[in-house]
Amino acid sequence: MSVLTKIKKKLRSGTWYPLYNTLYEKESVDSKMILLESRSGRGLESNIFALVKELNRPLYRDYTIVISYAKGFRDAVEKKLEQYGLKAGRIVQVGSLSYYRCLSRAGILINDSTFPGRFIKKDGQVYLNVWHGTPLKCMGRDNTEERYSMGNVMRNLLMSDYLLFPNAFMEEKMSGAYMLPELYQGEILHECYPRNEIFLHPEAGIRMKETLGVKEKELFVYMPTFRGKADAVDKNDSVEEIRGYLKRLDGLLKEKQILLVKLHPFVGNALSFSDYSHILPFPDKYDTYEVLNACDALITDYSSVMYDYANTGRKIILFAYDLEEYMGSRGVYEDIRTYPFPLVRTPEEVAKLLQTPSRPLEKGFLKKYCTYEHVGGTEKLCRQVVLKEEVCEVHRLSSNGKENVLLYAGNFDRNGITMAFCNLLKQIDQDKYNFFISYRGNSLKEAPWHLDVLEGDVRVYPIASEMNLDVLTAFAQAVYFKTGLRGMGIGKRLNQAYKREWKKHFGNSRFCHVIHYNGYENYMLSLIERCPFPRTVWVHNDMVRETETKKNPNRYVLRDTYGVCDHVAAVSTDITKSIVEISNREDNILVIPNCIDEEYIKNRAEQKISFDEETIANVSLEELQEILGNGDKKFISIGRFSGEKRHDRLIEAFNRYWKENTDTWLIIIGGVGNLYEETCKIASDCEAADHIILIRSMANPMPVLKKCDFFILTSDYEGLGIVLIEAAVLGVPMIATDVPGPHCLMTACGGTLVAPSADGVYEGMKAWENGKVKTISVDCEKNNRTSVELFMELLGGF
């Protein structure tokens, strides 16, 4: 393989991606270059095709048109251009070096979906998003299954200078799903969908019928929604159902009736049309909407094409044979049974309706779903965006007048930080600010259900992609992590990189305050350090000790982030010393105790004991319930399986105690952490092995805690030890090692502290046995009042 071939292979494979930062920084914006992308390059269709036709007019001869295509779609794009006599200055493959060069240069960007996660809009670029359809299915935050992955759509919409909304319904639903009124800084264009303008020219439909050779026939089209998964087409029951329905319908159509069938690309090839007399595949040679305009009726189910086709005033039949199943499995904005279209369940009913005259469409439906459709809209759209002429109806979204606060919460692992964050959300007055909860989508990909802890109508702002890391920045960051050095251009390069990252994720969105509540993650800490708004980072632990055992967070990252933040909020007085040791600054430190939801703790404790899908334990659920119900004494500890929790110390002390009291059990429940297997080994090697229960990942351990007699915290260090408060609320006596965090709480509440050693923990067990360990009392109401007051003062809004 030649050197040139190797280079070409690397460029095609995407290993050149780090060069995008160079292209972004070095390429000048060309105001005469227009990059258009349709559905991530999977063809040249819909609104983008209509815009390409308009941009081929002589009026735009000075502009270079660039069209992107996905791998495997180049021929389709080129044939489409040739078929219609259209020209493009160049076509580029999505993800290629040429693609990202054009993405960095083009003065005008037009997309009907999203650009990739690494894309950053440059100053001087104009971005028009013509989203690909009016939504019936719930989107964005309205779809709980989509909340973790909606980040790239959201940021693409927010960075757009223009959003095209062809109807009032779409504007309402898209705005709510992606929280546009509070964040969007661009303009809304109330104009027609370019693809729909063809429907306002019925004579073009007649010509298309002639072209297709069906001038004397009735032409219908069936366009159902795709069901199932893209990787399981052959096994998808709905494909078999459609095949059977089409066979029945084919036998019912008249001699001069033809049905075109356009299925989703994932299933289109799964059907053979050779056995049908009146049914043909949809002709791919022509634009979809030009063929639609030639059809006398549309048969669909839940597809947004119904809203577009309504512009023709022709018959629409909803063939929803699986209505209840579909509506039950997918969130939808409206019940299609209320629409002014006949809804049927069988092919026989479809055939009968095709023989009946159509009725005029209700004006109310057209007003709601075809609000801004009119002749000449495509031309006006191009004049507005490309030629900078003020010809479109422009609208700006109205916000609620409240300032925005961004709260980065991490990945919602089952731990004290997540619990404290959720408690804070419940306690604060969310009517005073627009609170946006942020998290990294990729970190939730394997466990999207972690977001279920977010209750109610919360605003979210997911981070869509990882860092755009180039070689020099990676080297600078490695040196910085190792030495803390910021000279020799290292600090400058990192500042440039993370400011670029902020722009990638948040664009022009404005916040009155940005809070890194999680307090971990080098990437997010570095991002917050370069945040252009007032910022606060929360501290939940002794970070000196954390950085001694963990690489993330890095000590130098904490030093510089703590040093520049407006506030560093510690959850207890005990850990402020470690903050000062890291940052050498104490004037920006606040102590804000964690909020406590007393009723929530009690209510959870009353729930049935259950394991989750991801729970791992050395006993079955039935065995656990039996043990909790016997008359033996049960000790419990709750905390992640990581080194600082010192479960080894606890097991050693318990083993010693058990040899004197064999009617005793130890239950350890932990969440994240990499020491579960090691802890199991330690437990199995001691005499009390059969009386030690280890449970990893349990969404609700409170019912177990309530049934236990004694709670033990054996950590080397903690931020606060919120589980101590949970035990106190449930009336469970406890001891804790005398370390920062628990020391402050237990001293204030008259609790029992023991030496941080196996001997100390054993002595604590004996003290409990002798009735010398009591439950502690925490004034939750007073604590929460203080916490909320301090939090609101931090924002400047108390």
Segments and roles (model prediction):
Residues S31-E37, K215-D231, K402-G410, E613-K645, ...:
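Conserved donor-binding/catalytic core segment of Leloir-type glycosyltransferases
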Residues S46-A50, A230-K247, G416-N423, K633-R656, ...:
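A conserved mid-protein helix/loop that constitutes part of the nucleotide-sugar donor-binding site
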Residues I67-K71, I258-V267, S438-K445, I596, ...:
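Glycosyltransferase donor-sugar binding loop
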Residues Y84-G85, V267-D284, V458-P462, T679-S697:
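Nucleotide-activated donor-binding/catalytic signature segment of Leloir-type glycosyltransferases, i.e.
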Residues F169, P194, D574, C595:
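Carbohydrate-associated surface elements
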Residues D716:
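Aromatic "clamp/platform" in nucleotide-sugar-dependent glycosyltransferases that forms part
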